[in-house]
Regions:
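Glycine/threonine-rich flexible loop motifs
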Residues: 103-112
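A cross-family phosphate/adenosyl-ligand binding-site feature
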Residues: 3, 7, 21-85
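Active-site rim beta-loop-alpha module in soluble metabolic enzymes
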Residues: 133-136, 146, 155-202
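Structural motif
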Residues: 6, 93-94
C-alpha cells in the first residue's frame, strides 16, 4: 500500500528552505515522510561528518504522516541520524535530498551536500535521489523540479528498481510546460577555475571570498548532463560510489 511507504527527506540548504518544503509535498504523495535536515545551511559539505563536537536534534513539526527534525550536523550527519537512531530497525523505501537551490551537475556532484546525503542514503540499501534546480535566485520557481521529481520518484517506487540506486537529478530553469523532458546522461567532464578575492576588514585583517567559473571541457557532447540542461532537458545521472579509476570512453 502506498501509505505504508516511508520516505526520508533531507537537504543541505536547511530544514526551513523553500526547496525542502517543495520536496516534502512531493514525498507526501507516496507515503509517510520523516525529514531530518540541517539546522543551518550546509552547502558544499559533500560527505563531511561531525566527529569532534556534540550534535543537537529538535523536532520542529509533527502531524499525521509527517515529522520534521532540525539537526545541527551536516547533510550526511542527518542521514546517519535518521537511519541509525530515529528510524533504526525500520524500512526506508526512498531517500530524497533536495530540492537544492542551484545546480549539482558535472563535477559539482563531488562538492554537493545534497548529493552527499543522497549517496549516504544509498549506502543503507534503498534508492536515493538528489534533486536540484539550476536556479540560484531568491524567488526561484520550484514547480518544474517538483513535477519531474514526482515522476522520477514514482518510477523508482513503482518500477521495481534494484537498490541501491542513487540518481543525480538536475532540473533547468523554466515552467514545467517549457521543459523538453528527461534525459539519462553521463556526468560532464568539467571543472571549476577558482579565484580568491582578497579584502581587508575595518581592523586591517585580510579575508578572502572564493569565486570562480565553470569550465566545460566538452560543450558539444550531447550525452552529458551539462548539454541536457543547456537544451532544456532534465538530466538524470546514475551515481556510483566506487571511485576505482577506469579508462574513460573515447
Amino acid at each position: 500500500m502506498m501509505n505504508e511507504r516511508l520516505i526520508l527527506v533531507t537537504n543541505d540548504d536547511g530544514y526551513d528552505s523553500r526547496g525542502i518544503a517543495a520536496a516534502i509535498e512531493v514525498a507526501r504523495r507516496f507515503g509517510r515522510v520523516v525529514v531530518v535536515a540541517p539546522e543551518t545551511t550546509q552547502s558544499g559539505m559533500s560527505q563531511a561528518i561531525t566527529m569532534n563536537t556534540p550534535l543537537f536534534l529538535r523536532r520542529v513539526r509533527s502531524e499525521e504522516g509527517l515529522d520534521v527534525y532540525a539537526f545541527s550536523g551536516t547533510p550526511v550527519d542527518c542521514v546517519k541520524m535518521a537511519f541509525d537512531y530515529l528510524l533504526r530497525g525500520k524500512r526506508v523505501d526512498l531517500v530524497l535530498s533536495g530540492i537544492n537551490h542551484g545546480s549539482n551537475s558535472a563535477v559539482n556532484v563531488l562538492y554537493s551536500g545534497t548529493m552527499g546525503a543522497a549517496i549516504e542514503g544509498s549506502f543503507y540499501g534503498c534508492p536515493a535521489v538528489g534533486l536540484s534546480l539550476t536556479d540560484y535566485s531568491a524567488d526561484a520557481d520550484f514547480d518544474a523540479a517538483a513535477l519531474y521529481g514526482e515522476r522520477i520518484l514514482r518510477r523508482l517506487l513503482e518500477g521495481g528498481v534494484q537498490p541501491p540506486l542513487c540518481l543525480n537529478v538536475n532540473v533547468p530553469v523554466g515552467r514545467p510546460e517549457e521543459l523538453r523532458g528527461i534525459r539519462l546522461c553521463r556526468q560532464n567532464r568539467g571543472f571549476w577555475r577558482e579565484e580568491f578575492y582578497r579584502h581587508e576588514d575595518p581592523r586591517g585583517r585580510e579575508y578572502f571570498w572564493l569565486t570562480g567559473d565553470f569550465v566545460n571541457q566538452e560543450p558539444e557532447a550531447e550525452d552529458t548532463d551539462e548539454w541536457a540542461l543547456a537544451h532544456g532537458y532534465v538530466s538524470v545521472v546514475p551515481v556510483q560510489t566506487c571511485l576505482l579509476y577506469t579508462s574513460p570512453s573515447p
